[in-house]
């Protein structure tokens, strides 16, 4: 089953975004502190343009966009675009997101 939602983990994310759910479409999801990001983070450890989630077929991939503090899939630092299994935590600064059905 392909993921349909991007969820910000309630137990892992600080601030007003905890528990937020975003419905995924075909367009990439730009994540960062920039006002024009798809997901705008109020996380001092996130870069202005931190990471991007994009769909390739039925799979979703995350790539770091040259952030200062890195993007992590589970506990591994993302250095190239990497597939994101459903339910696997992606950490951007202090923010943790997961793909959900």
Where are these regions (language model features)?
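Intrinsically disordered, low-complexity acidic Ser/Thr-rich regulatory segments
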Residues: 1-42, 54, 91, 96-98
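Short coil-to-beta-strand transition motifs
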Residues: 45-48
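A generic beta-sheet turn/junction motif
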Residues: 55-57, 66
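Short, basic/aromatic beta-hairpin or loop at an interaction surface
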Residues: 62-71
């Amino acid at each position: 089953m392909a993921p349909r939602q991007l969820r910000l983990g309630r137990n892992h994310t600080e601030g007003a975004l905890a528990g937020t759910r975003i419905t995924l479409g075909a367009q990439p999801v730009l994540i960062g502190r920039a006002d024009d990001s798809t997901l705008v983070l109020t996380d001092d450890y996130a870069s202005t343009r931190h990471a991007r989630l994009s769909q390739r077929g039925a799979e979703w991939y995350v790539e770091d966009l040259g952030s200062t503090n890195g993007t992590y899939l589970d506990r591994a630092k993302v250095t190239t675009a990497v597939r994101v299994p459903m339910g696997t935590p992606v950490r951007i600064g202090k923010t943790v997101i997961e793909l959900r059905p």
